[in-house]
Amino acid sequence: MAGRKLALKTIDWVSFVEVMPQNQKAIGNALKSWNETFHARLASLSEKPPAIDWAYYRANVAKPGLVDDFEKKYNALKIPVPEDKYTALVDQEEKEDVKSCAEFVSGSQLRIQEYEKQLEKMRNIIPFDQMTIDDLNEIFPETKLDKKKYPYWPHQPIENL
């Protein structure tokens, strides 16, 4: 059990050190050595504790019934393993993040296509020194003045000036 749990929770120390500030490298090295020591001690433990030889204790303990009482209490002792209520939440958030990332990527692909069309349009326009005002208004419609809606000069709303 210790070995299996140990394999699940590993730290990528190379990337950890890359993001660590220079003045905290000593603290990071101490953390890494402590972590390696802890993992080595954890890996040396067996999955189940060794069996207790109750007959040996019955033979060597002077007070009768004491070992039997300890054995009953030891066998009745059940240490609960804390329930893992956060892994499901993290998995759900991961699925939502994957979904939102996929939406963002698809939206980005659409924006890229639109920008590539605009870029191609910009590459194919007439040079500005050869362009007439009609060509400019055709290529960039936002520059066209609306003389019907705004009959007086500057032919656009005052807010846009």
From Swiss-Prot:
Alphabetized InterPro entries for the sequence: ATP_synth_F0_dsu_mt, ATP_synth_F0_dsu_sf_mt
N6-succinyllysine carried by residues: K78, K85, K95, K144, K149
Location in the cell: Mitochondrion; Mitochondrion inner membrane
GO cellular component entries: mitochondrial inner membrane; mitochondrion; myelin sheath; proton-transporting ATP synthase complex
Keyword annotations from UniProtKB, A to Z: Acetylation, CF(0), Hydrogen ion transport, Ion transport, Membrane, Mitochondrion, Mitochondrion inner membrane, Transport
Primary location class: mitochondrion
Annotated disulfide bonds: none
Modified residues (N6-acetyllysine): K32, K48, K63, K72, K78, K85, K95, K117, K144, K149
Any GO BP: proton motive force-driven mitochondrial ATP synthesis
TM segment ranges: none
N-acetylalanine PTM sites in chain numbering: A2
Top-rank lineage group of the source organism: Eukaryota
GO molecular function: proton-transporting ATP synthase activity, rotational mechanism
Gene3D superfamilies: 6.10.280.70
Subunit text: Component of the ATP synthase complex composed at least of ATP5F1A/subunit alpha, ATP5F1B/subunit beta, ATP5MC1/subunit c (homooctomer), MT-ATP6/subunit a, MT-ATP8/subunit 8, ATP5ME/subunit e, ATP5MF/subunit f, ATP5MG/subunit g, ATP5MK/subunit k, ATP5MJ/subunit j, ATP5F1C/subunit gamma, ATP5F1D/subunit delta, ATP5F1E/subunit epsilon, ATP5PF/subunit F6, ATP5PB/subunit b, ATP5PD/subunit d, ATP5PO/subunit OSCP.
Function recorded in the entry: Subunit d, of the mitochondrial membrane ATP synthase complex (F(1)F(0) ATP synthase or Complex V) that produces ATP from ADP in the presence of a proton gradient across the membrane which is generated by electron transport complexes of the respiratory chain. ATP synthase complex consist of a soluble F(1) head domain - the catalytic core - and a membrane F(1) domain - the membrane proton channel. These two domains are linked by a central stalk rotating inside the F(1) region and a stationary peripheral stalk.
Family membership noted in the UniProt record: Belongs to the ATPase d subunit family.
Full protein name: ATP synthase peripheral stalk subunit d, mitochondrial
